[in-house]
């Protein structure tokens, strides 16, 4: 039962992480968020939350949960290692996709070639994925691993 609750908590933590980041960026008027009104930012939060929840569910079932239990079995019940695993697993889909797109463009000699802005955007997406992975790992750790 705790594992099922942990999967639910990890899945729900990702949309909350996105809402926290987008809300903070809107409050601080950073970049695109500073130029848009709150209704559009709210729609963006809903869209990204709807997309990220199934991805978080799949990653928790396929990799995050088993990895957390393996770490706990090896005696690593502290939050730090579980957080690092969440950060890595959260960033992995973005790194793989961006690496595929940039690599394919380079191999096919597509014009225009990826510039520094493309790489910066890829790093931003990977950072958002890592942030969401940290929240999911924390939620799973609190519900399932802590206090074992």
Protein language model annotation of sequence segments:
Residues 1-148:
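Juxtamembrane/disordered regions of integral membrane proteins
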